């Protein structure tokens, strides 16, 4: 229930967070990493349930929830470096490949009240990972920070605002002469 309330934005301040920790009789300590997993196939819910089951033994310090057709894994006491992080990423990659799913991993963070920002990071990692590297199954947000910043702006701009005039001229030449851009260059 805690992870559901946290991801839904119902825990808004330190007092509420501490009350949850008291009620659960545990404290979920930083650093944190949030992972999102999406499956885009006909049996999406079944795939996410199977992925959830497979991921439950990956890490000792994690909370898992399927929320709005996305599987979220909150890893707490997360290692910032080293073999355990690499092993987690490697194991997760194998799992998502098996189910033809995609996963995005946020940057490390230390404040659970800012989880919404990191939720966006995970979903952006998946979105821009699919655009820039369609075969990737595991996308780290840190690898897609620049596209996450630039793509929304480029999508709103007319092509001639960012396309150099020289490329327009080459495209026109190629159309007139039935040639291709690469050989023309």
Annotate each language-model stretch with its function:
Residues 1-185:
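Cytosolic nucleotide-utilizing catalytic cores of signal-transduction proteins
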